[in-house]
Amino acid sequence: QVYAYTRTLGEVSCLVVLNFSDKTARWAPIGLSLGEQPWINSADQLIQEGKELILAPFQSIVIPLN
């Protein structure tokens, strides 16, 4: 349902998260320190509850890593 991976170019790293489902998905980026705002977001907003991301159906995001 959720496909996630990191990308790094030089000293810049980001997390790519894709919800391939037609249902809302909860996903916890364990061990990763997320930046504040997504660089790319296919939805109107990014919802976080505690340490979990709440992804809308078919939502995709690219978030900088600290």
What does each model-identified segment do?
Residues 1-66:
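Carbohydrate-interacting/catalytic domains
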